Design a protein with these regions (language model features):
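Multi-pass alpha-helical transmembrane bundles in non-GPCR membrane proteins
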Residues: 1-161
């Protein structure tokens, strides 16, 4: 049945994109809390968790309910807000962190994003190639972003303890 296949694809897309929103919601909550902590008003663990869950549910609901560019715009806004808090922390409260993992994250994400755009706009797209496609490269490169984020946040945890 075509309707069931379509629903399965839609669910797969929501799960696929949902992982991106979990990732960016995590960075946004962590960076917001770091920024607030520097201002002596950090969030409790409970409030961090509530904010993370709320952002995640809201973001994934937006993707599930709206097709098209709404989800892309929301993701971009969350990236910008998370990056804003990180840049404010760097600018005002620089604690001599090693920013190499964060820079590598940005580079890998930028390359992955560029490949994703080339794939989604069908600029570079071979639908007969079932071995590797732009979307697959997007996922592979983004998997390294998790490693780089871990390495970056691990040093912050070490400094704060």
């Amino acid at each position: 049945d075509v309707g069931e296949e379509f629903d399965g694809l839609w669910v797969g897309e929501v799960v696929d994109v949902g992982a991106m929103y979990l990732f960016i919601a995590f960075t946004l909550v962590i960076n917001l809390n770091r920024w607030l902590t520097e201002k002596n008003s950090g969030l409790s663990k409970h409030n961090q968790l509530l904010l993370f869950i709320s952002l995640s549910i809201f973001s994934i609901a937006v993707v599930a309910l709206f097709k098209g560019t709404v989800g892309i715009i929301l993701f971009a806004v969350l990236v910008i807000v998370s990056g804003h808090f990180e840049s404010e922390i760097y600018r005002k409260y620089n604690k001599g962190l090693n920013y190499k993992p964060l820079i590598l994250l940005i580079v890998f994400f930028g390359i992955a994003w560029g490949i994703w755009w080339l794939d989604i706009t069908k600029t570079v797209c071979d639908q007969n190639n079932h071995f590797i496609q732009g979307h697959a490269i997007w996922h592979i490169l983004n998997s390294f972003c998790f490693l780089f984020l871990y390495k970056y946040y691990k040093q912050i945890s070490s400094i704060n303890n």
